[in-house]
Design a protein with these regions (language model features):
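Short secondary-structure boundary segments
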Residues: 49, 129, 156-157
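Histidine-anchored nucleotide/phosphate-binding helix
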Residues: 33-37, 137-147
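Active-site catalytic pocket residues across diverse enzymes, especially alpha/beta-hydrolases
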Residues: 87, 108, 112, 146-147
């Protein structure tokens, strides 16, 4: 059984908005179905939300990626509608101003401590979402650093990268770091 499903940044701007892609749009039904299955199985679901402020263009990320996106409170910051419909009570979300969420990493580590699995041994954590080559890989590696013995799983069919090539490259990076890629 999976101890946690982590859904990364399935927000409008990354799926159907200013940074969206047909690949990201294509995974929405499968991600929503996976969330529903996790809920039915009693698996905790955690969401991340890329969250920027109005001064985004003045930030380091804004200088390197000059496309204002996921501005707090904007329509693009909200979850893609089908993903929003798949949400249920008890879900936790973490807003993050950058690619990886240290708050998420600490949350997962605390859960491991509660279970008596300080290194993550015996835990299975699944990640999915967008973008494979930016936020998915960043969060997977943060969790791997915090819980080196946990089984981390990334289902490639439930992820989309900036491009198909970058998606594949990120999957290979995660495989190299002993993350199971389906």
């Amino acid at each position: 059984m999976t101890d946690m499903l982590i859904v990364i940044d399935m927000q409008r701007d990354f799926v159907s908005g200013c940074l969206g892609s047909k690949e990201a749009q294509g995974i929405v039904p499968a991600v929503a179905a996976r969330m529903q299955r996790a809920h039915e199985e009693g698996t905790p679901i955690v969401l991340t939300l890329d969250t920027h402020e109005e001064d985004y263009m003045e930030t380091r990320e804004g200088r390197f990626l000059p496309v204002a996106h996921c501005i707090r409170g904007s329509e693009g910051w909200t979850l893609e509608p089908e993903i929003g419909k798949a949400c249920c009570r008890g879900m936790i979300s973490f807003e993050k101003p950058t690619f990886g969420s240290t708050a998420l990493m600490h949350h997962v580590a605390a859960l491991a401590m509660e279970k008596g699995c300080i290194s993550g041994r015996g835990m299975t954590i699944e990640l999915c979402g967008v973008c494979t080559d930016i936020c998915v890989v960043s969060n997977a590696l943060l969790i791997k650093a915090a819980l080196p013995e946990a089984d981390l799983i990334v289902d490639s069919a439930l992820c989309a990268g900036v491009t198909p090539e970058k998606h594949k490259a990120a999957l290979e990076t995660m495989r190299s770091c002993q993350i199971q890629v389906l």
